[in-house]
From Swiss-Prot:
Name of the protein: Uncharacterized protein UU161
Length: 111
């Protein structure tokens, strides 16, 4: 019997106020299972969500970058918030680069 998993990984880079932070060395991932009869066009048989909070310093002010990834059968959504902790506001003057990759892993389970 075979069990298949979809592994979705993403890498972030963030630019704000003439400085940049690169999280290309961070490895965020989600894993989804699907059975052997599932069509590859509809591989996400299970929905899932993960959230990462990263504390960073921007010009000596602490900020949280919140990354939420939500996957459903229709696709994968990535939401990003940059929160200024001191002023308790959402920052809007930043740009985010997102690279991603996905792979399928098959695990054979003996009966």
């Amino acid at each position: 019997m075979a069990n298949h998993e979809v592994i979705f990984k993403w890498y972030l880079s963030l630019n704000f106020n003439n400085s940049s932070v690169d999280w290309s060395d961070k490895d965020y991932s989600l894993t989804f299972s699907f059975d052997r009869n599932t069509d590859r066009n509809n591989m996400l048989s299970d929905s899932g969500e993960t959230q990462q909070q990263i504390l960073l310093w921007n010009q000596y002010q602490p900020q949280f970058l919140v990354v939420r990834v939500n996957a459903e059968k229709s696709g994968v959504n990535v939401d990003l918030w940059l929160i200024d902790i001191v002023n308790k506001t959402f920052a809007t003057n930043f740009e985010v680069g997102l690279n991603y990759e996905w792979s399928v892993r098959t695990i054979y389970v003996g009966e």
